[in-house]
Amino acid sequence: MSAYLTPGQIKSALANTPQITFEVTDACNLRCEYCAYGKLYSDYDKREDRMLPTETAKRFIDYMAALWASPDNHSVNNNLYVGFYGGEPLLNTPFIKEIVGYLKAGGHAKRFAYNMTTNAMLLDRHMDFLVEHNFSLLISLDGNTENDSYRIKADGKPSFEQVVKNVDMLHAAYPEYFAKKVNFNAVLHNRNSVDGIRGFIKERYGKTPRIGDINDSGIREDMKEEFKRMYRNSYESLLQNENYDEIEKEMFLSSPTYHSATIFLMQNSPFKYENYNELLFGKNENKTFCPTGTCIPFSRKVFVTVNGKILPCERIGHQYSVGHVDANGVMLDFEAIADKYNTYYSCLEKKCRLCKNQRTCIQCMFYLNGLENGKCECNGFMDEKQFERYRQTQLAFFVRHPDAYSEIMKNVIYK
C-alpha cells in the first residue's frame, strides 16, 4: 500500500490547524425539514439533546496546547478560530462562556477568534456577550416567509417572524458590529431561489448571503424521493435569472460559477504559488499525488462532537471519526489515521489516475458511496470529453467576465 500520508504530516496538521470547532449540543429549538441531522439522513449519531461537557472540551484544549508548545507547531501567534456548532449552540451558552474564559486565561501563543452558526432564535438573550467577544456570526435564513418555511419550530409553526425580529434587534443595537461581523447562510430548495434569497437579505440587511445546496450525502434509502422533491441546484437556479451576470459579480466566491472558475484557475495557473518558497525557488514537481480533493486531516479544522468523537470536519458522517476525547483523555493514533486514509486512497487511485480532472478535483472522498467497503465510485469522474466541456465552461466564464482573472488572482487566498 502506498504511503500518501505519514503520521508526522497528520500530527503537524493538527498542531497547526487554523480552527477548532466544538459541537456544543445536539439539541435544537428548530426542526428544519432538510437538516443534515434530520429525517432525510442516516450518517450521524443519534440526537439525544446532549450537551458537551466543558471538562471534555478543556481536556481537548489542553491536548492541543501541548502540541502548540511542541516543535510541530510552526504557526506561533497565528489566529486560531474557535467555532461553536450545534444543534443550536446558544442552547448551551454556559459552555461557550466558560470555554472563551478558559482560552483567554490559558496564556497560549495563539490569537483566538470566535465564530458561530446560529438560527438566531435566542439571539436577543445573548447578543451582548457575542458582541463583547467579537464573535463572527453566520445566521441561517432562507429568505422571506415562504422561502424560509422549511425552518420550523418543534410545534410545527414557522420560525421566520421570531428570527427576523431578533436579527433586526441586533442590527439596531449594534450597527457597526452587524456590518463587520454578521453574515447570512441560506439553503436552496424548492421553495426559494438564488435571486429570491439574495434579494430579500440584500434589501433588508445589506448583506450578500452564502447559498448552498441541500446536503446530498448520507441520504436514507426511504427518503430519496423526498430529497429529490426538495433539492434544487444553485448553479442552475443562478442561470435561470435574467440578471445573473449582476448576481454573479455581487456574490463573487459565494456564486457557484465564480467558485468553480476560481478553483479551475488556482489549480491550473502557472502564476499561483502556495508560499514564498515556491515563488522564489520554484515549485516542487515531485509532490506526492493524493487521490481526490480530500483535505489532509486537520489541515483546515478539527471537529469535536457532543459525544467526544474527533473528526477532520463537521460536514462528513460521524462514522468517519478518527479519535475520541473523554474522561480518560484524548485518544488520537496518528499512525492509525494515516493507515486509514492510505487505504482509502489506494482504493481510489486507479480511478483517479484516469480522471482528466485530477488536478482541479475538489471531491471529498467521504461523500462517495462505497468508501468503507472498497467499492467506491466517484460522481465527479471526467473522461476527455467531459473535461473539455468543463474546461470550455470555465474559459467562457473568463471571456464573459474579463476582469475576474485579475480580481481572483489579487484577492483570493486559496488553500
Where are these regions (language model features)?
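Conserved alpha-helical substructure of the radical SAM core
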Residues: 3-126
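Cysteine-centered iron-sulfur cluster-binding motifs in ferredoxin-type domains/subunits
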Residues: 24-31, 298, 352-354, 358-359
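Radical SAM enzyme [4Fe-4S]-AdoMet core and its adjacent flexible, acidic
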Residues: 150-164, 168-293, 297, 307
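Flexible mid-to-C-terminal extensions adjoining Fe-S/redox cofactors in radical SAM and related proteins
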Residues: 292, 309-310, 315-415
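Conserved radical SAM core fold
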Residues: 41-42, 89-91, 120-124, 136-157, ...
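Glycine-enriched alpha-helix->loop->beta-strand junction motifs that scaffold or abut catalytic
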Residues: 131-137, 205-207
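Hydrophobic faces of well-ordered beta-strands that scaffold small-molecule active sites
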Residues: 20, 82, 114-116, 137-139, ...
